[in-house]
């Protein structure tokens, strides 16, 4: 999919690139594509196996012939010996009935070279800023994304934490990376439709739009030690070889029994489960096009619970030019931007008494 300027909107054209994951694995070290081009294709960290915290000793014992080192500062990480590192998915499958172990899957958002979502955010005229509502008692939404920059929409709100600022140029080439500003954009969608929420931001995604099971699981575990939020928003995810959720993610999400977990359904245009969105109890959100039909890139299947606008979405954004950050607005497409729309709806329902409907910005129409 690509984004083109045209009348202030993004023209969305969907296309899949079957060689995209192998190409990514060639460009970035430490990645392996399992079953490239096949029905079990998934992207993993080479030679890494993960196991829930309570089963680390069992996994290390069962897998001792293949394991080089074991790390326990977070979800259990078993590093395989180099000769078998590329076989991590197969090795995990061989013992999966005995211990809940799986490869460390790489999670993705957005990049069109990979999976056909809005190529890059397109600069747009900003809509009116969200109202400065104060909800009492507070309704908290925790966002796991690229971080949150001090955009004028939320920089002076009492909940804003400057330590969560986005890293915009990870490769230090002087240009913002392809998914830079993703978290700031998602937070803007949330505030446009639930302007009184309190946002907690966790920076788990790189500005290239990548994270993995272990990084997300560690962040979820940290969040579970705090007063639990009303809503969690997850904007990235992964496919797995066996189409089952990575055990460490299921284990950590089970720590939030009273929290509504909302997750992007993914942009791979498939019916394969996308994790953690496809977990029972998680609200999986697909993207709808401007006419209300499912967007061509959105994942489909009985595990997708809701659809929300995910094409030409208008929200807050941060850009990088000459090393200087500038704040404004952009249009972008993807299920990542449908998920916060549903999260906002849930957050508004958690407020007692419920607030009046959010006003529509007539001068700047758009999702």
Give the positions of each predicted feature:
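Inhibitory N-terminal propeptides of secreted protease zymogens
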Residues: 2-109
């Amino acid at each position: 999919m690509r984004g083109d300027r045209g009348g202030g909107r993004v023209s969305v054209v969907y296309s899949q690139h079957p060689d995209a994951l192998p190409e990514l694995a060639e460009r970035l070290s430490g990645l392996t594509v399992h079953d490239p081009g096949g029905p079990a294709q998934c992207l993993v960290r080479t030679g890494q196996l993960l196991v829930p915290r309570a089963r680390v000793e069992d996994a290390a014992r069962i897998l001792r012939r293949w394991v080089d080192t074991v790390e326990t500062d977070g979800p259990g990480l078993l590093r395989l010996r180099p000769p078998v590192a590329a076989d991590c998915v197969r090795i995990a499958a061989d013992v999966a009935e005995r211990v809940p172990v799986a490869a460390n899957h790489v999670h993705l958002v957005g990049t069109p070279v990979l999976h056909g979502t809005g190529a890059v955010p397109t600069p747009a005229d900003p809509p009116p800023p969200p109202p400065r509502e104060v909800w009492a008692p507070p309704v908290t939404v925790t966002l796991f994304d690229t971080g949150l920059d001090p955009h004028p929409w939320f920089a002076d709100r009492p909940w804003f934490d400057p330590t969560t600022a986005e890293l915009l140029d990870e490769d230090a080439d002087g240009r913002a990376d392809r998914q830079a500003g993703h978290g700031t954009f998602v937070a803007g969608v949330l505030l446009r439709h639930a302007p009184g929420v309190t946002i907690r931001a966790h920076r788990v995604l790189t500005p290239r739009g990548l994270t993995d099971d272990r990084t997300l699981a560690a962040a979820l575990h940290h969040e579970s030690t705090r007063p639990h939020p009303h809503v969690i928003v997850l904007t990235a995810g992964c496919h797995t070889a066996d189409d089952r959720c990575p055990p460490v993610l299921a284990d950590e999400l089970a720590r939030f029994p009273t929290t509504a977990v909302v997750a992007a359904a993914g942009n791979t245009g498939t019916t394969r489960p996308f994790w953690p969105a496809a977990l029972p109890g998680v609200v999986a959100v697909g993207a709808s096009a401007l006419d209300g039909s499912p967007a061509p890139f959105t994942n489909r299947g009985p595990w997708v619970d809701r659809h929300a606008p995910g094409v030409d979405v208008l929200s807050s954004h941060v850009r990088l030019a000459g090393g200087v950050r500038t704040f404004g607005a952009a249009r972008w497409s993807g299920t990542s931007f449908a998920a916060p729309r549903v999260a906002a709806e849930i957050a508004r329902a958690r407020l007692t008494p419920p607030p009046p409907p959010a006003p529509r910005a007539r001068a700047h129409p758009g999702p």
